[in-house]
From Swiss-Prot:
Subcellular location, record wording: Cell membrane
UniProt xrefs under InterPro entries: SOD-like_Cu/Zn_dom_sf, SOD_Cu/Zn_/chaperone, SOD_Cu/Zn_BS, SOD_Cu_Zn_dom
Region (Disordered): 381-404
Protein name: Extracellular superoxide dismutase [Cu-Zn] 2
Gene: sodB
Membrane topology, from the record: Single-pass type I membrane protein
Record topological domains on the Extracellular side: 21-406
Presence of keyword Cell membrane: yes
Residues with attached carbohydrate: 38, 57, 81, 190, 218, 288, 376
Family that this chain belongs to: Belongs to the Cu-Zn superoxide dismutase family.
GO CC entries: plasma membrane
Enzyme class per UniProt: oxidoreductase
Amino acid sequence: MNKLIISLLIVLSAISIISADYQYGYCKFGSVGTVNQNITGYVTLTAQDGALNLVYNISSINLPTGSYATAIMTYGYNPSNNTDLGGVFQVDGKGTEQCQSGGSRAGDLYNLYVNDNRISSNFDSLTSVSIVDSPNSIIGRSIAIFQESYSCDLLKSSVGTSVGPLTTVVASCIIGIGNSANVPATNGVNTTTGNANTAGAYSSLSNTQYDAMVLLANTTKSPSAAIGGSVLFRSSSNSVSVNGIVSGVAKSVHGFHIHAFGDLTTVDGASIGGHWLSGAQVHAFPENTSRHFGDLGNLCIFDNDFKNAYYYLSTSYFSFSGLVGRGFAVHAARDDGNTYVGGDRVAQGVVALIPKAATTLNQVPSNWKYEVICSNGTYTGESTIEPSPTPSTTPTPTETSQPGTSSYLAPFFVLILSSLISVILIL
């Protein structure tokens, strides 16, 4: 009997290992600041029943040999200053600046080492942060590389970089939900059928502290290399407003969607996956209550010069925290709300946490009429403005319907004059 129980426990343990969910995130670097260090590469983030593992694959042709601190930052992006990312991420406000340890801040990592314009592969294993729904989730936040190094670096005396404090960001990336199809085999997680990627942002993010934004950049599917702009997601207690301003797109209708993954592994837009959805949701237009969470319809309203396209929607259909860390796409053609979602993805980006936005950020004209189905094609916003009332051409009361004194005097004198003439003729 005891052997049977032990055997069952072994089997159940094996099943739990095989079917264990995992988390996968992806973070693609780009240079920031006044000096372009031409830093490229990415970080993969994986966890499965344990610590969060970060694996770096980064290169640079402009960084001198030395050591450079890395840290997880509070914001994924800051529209007013792309090097001010809100400071190193802290869960409880405790900790001091140092390499990851018991006394460090949650977001403090380690130093990267640069030699011959190559940043060496590095591996961090963390327990202070996660990429699953919890107060210490870093989905939607950023990883920054600093000009300075941590003082805990034993090699600091042999390199040219200065030792803290960490003030000068030279590169950063937005931590997005990764596409499971791209998990490197060397990352040590079991992605077999039945295991789900449960990465996500903290579901109780403060709507008084954060908004979210995606910066758009063209993909290799775009005929234009000049697509840009951004989409702002402004959070409130019971809704999310979506304000988009997009430049460089063709003068046509474009599908406009939130996608499942904030994963920029591929430059053609494929790695952001399908639309963000849950369960049995189907592709449809707003405000269909069974549609994908990511179905925002179309982008079709332009300014008079057709230089910028504008989008606006306020909805309570999806949560603010649910969209953080996901991908976003502008499509080449119109989404028909049925089987055709718009073809190639001509622009993409990752939804990042940002500080609570000023009311003027991504402010679309408030007197335009916005629609997202766009069945009649493109139009200009100015054409939707209600015309001002034109001055009335109806005669004033003193002119016609309510004649004044002068209106009565003229016929009266005519009558008197006619009577006098008649009397004279009789005489």
